[in-house]
């Protein structure tokens, strides 16, 4: 209950309230940018659960996102399955893929786990291209159904989904399971010596991360109306997700949302700079990571504790 009296809770509550009212104040274009940013925020939060708490660096978050997105797209486009069932199926498919990837990968140590997740993304990219008759190949595939054609409704869907995921993931991170994950990530040997099943908890974390990633991937394609390698599987998208989570603050969960919103909005507004766009955003992100290694939210929280 102490959390509900904390400054972080009230800041989050006011932020959500203001965000919910934004459709009455800003243009449809800005709403579309923020809508995409909110889905990326869920991607970043899911990645932070695995890295920030379990201590495992997943270099291929788009493998899980892509599994969910393409599963939903194929079911909707080919078989006419309604959106809610497609989203559920996408979550289950991503979880299944997460389990199949996590069980062998977590037996590895050091950088090898990250390399396995990166290779998984490359395999999925090749699968999409090879089976173009089913997936649409490099062009991508459209879905006949979308969440809404109204920008305001799409925005509220994304915001509501983001808030729900944030509450669930933040609650998990503060639970007994979250504390065990954090202990396992910081010192797996010591955690095992205390009697915790480190591998089981890390596999569970991978599955939870996959669940949220796959669900968000499905929601994103039903917002955009299409699934393609460039939007849900590309390695560059995965890099952006990782930067967003680190930028916001490791082990904060909510900081990942701040990082995602910053990256997406900055990329959009700096688009007129052309090739300088990526350079400027990367330079800002690098400066924040170097001077504020705890991330933006992590730095703010620790500074508040010191005061």
Show where each model-derived region lies.
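Extracellular/periplasmic helix-loop junction at the C-terminal end of a transmembrane helix
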Residues: 117-150, 178, 299
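Alpha-helical transmembrane segments of multi-pass integral membrane proteins
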Residues: 22-25, 99, 148-184, 203
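Alpha-helical transmembrane segments within multi-pass membrane transporters and channels
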Residues: 79-122, 258-260
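Intracellular coupling helices
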Residues: 173-213
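Transmembrane alpha-helical segments in multi-pass inner-membrane proteins
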Residues: 62, 206-291, 301
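Single transmembrane alpha-helix segments in multi-pass membrane proteins
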Residues: 23-78, 104-113, 181, 187-192, ...
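Cytosolic-side transmembrane-helix boundaries in multi-pass membrane proteins
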Residues: 1-20, 186, 192-203, 270-307
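Loop-to-helix entry region at the N-terminal start of transmembrane alpha-helices
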Residues: 31-36, 146-167, 226-228, 277-281
């Amino acid at each position: 209950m102490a959390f509900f009296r904390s400054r972080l809770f009230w800041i989050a509550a006011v932020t959500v309230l203001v965000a919910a009212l934004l459709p009455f104040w800003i243009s449809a274009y800005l709403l579309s940018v923020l809508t995409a940013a909110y889905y990326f925020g869920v991607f970043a939060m899911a990645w932070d659960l695995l890295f920030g708490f379990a201590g495992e660096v997943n270099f291929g978050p788009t493998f899980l996102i892509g599994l969910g997105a393409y599963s939903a797209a194929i079911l909707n486009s080919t078989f006419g399955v309604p959106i809610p069932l497609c989203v559920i199926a996408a979550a289950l498919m991503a979880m299944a893929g997460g389990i199949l990837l996590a069980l062998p990968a977590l037996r590895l140590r050091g950088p090898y786990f990250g390399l396995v997740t990166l290779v998984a993304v490359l395999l999925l990219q090749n699968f999409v291209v090879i089976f173009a008759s089913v997936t649409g190949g490099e062009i991508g595939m459209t879905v006949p159904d979308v969440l809404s054609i109204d920008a305001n409704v799409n925005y509220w869907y994304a915001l509501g989904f983001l808030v729900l995921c944030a509450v669930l993931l933040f609650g998990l991170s503060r639970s007994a399971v979250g504390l065990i994950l954090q202990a396992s990530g910081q010192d797996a040997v010591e955690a095992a010596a205390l009697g915790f099943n480190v591998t089981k908890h890390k596999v569970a974390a991978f599955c939870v991360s996959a669940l949220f990633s796959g669900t968000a991937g499905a929601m994103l394609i039903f917002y955009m109306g299409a699934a393609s390698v460039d939007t849900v599987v590309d390695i560059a998208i995965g890099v952006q997700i990782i930067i967003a989570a680190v930028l916001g603050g490791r082990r904060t969960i909510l900081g990942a949302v701040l990082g995602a919103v910053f990256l997406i909005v900055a990329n959009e507004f700096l688009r007129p700079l052309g090739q300088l766009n990526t350079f400027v955003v990367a330079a800002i992100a690098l400066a924040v990571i170097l001077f504020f290694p705890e991330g933006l939210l992590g730095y703010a929280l620790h500074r508040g504790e010191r005061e």
